[in-house]
Amino acid sequence: MSAISWNCRGLGNPLTVKALQKVVLEKDPTLVFLMETKFSVNQMEGIKGKIERQEGLVVPSVKCGGGLALLWKRTVNVDVLTYSPRHIDVVVIEEQGTRKWRFTGFYGHLETGKREESWKLLESLSNRSNLPWICMGDYNEVMYAREKEGGGVRPKGQMRNFQEAINRSRLRDLGYVGSD
């Protein structure tokens, strides 16, 4: 079982779609969580076919921004619990129902002033189930200054608020692979 999470910053560019196809072909993940698709539900149907993930849930973009999609292989059953423009929360059932776990794809607010709303959502999600849980996505914040490449210096208070939300949610930072 594997999952990838990718902030694609829009799927309107054919090169972005090709890059997504390449990653999915190489890694063959069971789950694919996409953020900032900037696509409607109908537009995402074409993407699902291109990456051979026919099952999924799409939260359409609003105007020209946002948009989430969680796509999965037919080899697993997925029960959708909740979703919003900031998250998709599901239970994954594998191996004829013998293994269950929870996956949350999460997309934190871009606006610094609204991040506290993101952290409250994260904490609320953490209390909804006792199943093993993985939460991945783009939180739009870093845990430590050393994780930030380019741009301005992150205020310590912002990082501390994120660290505290992660701790209160009983999550562990597993790091990431990829570019910013």
What are these regions (language model features)?
Residues 1-180:
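A shared catalytic/ligand-binding motif for oxyanion handling
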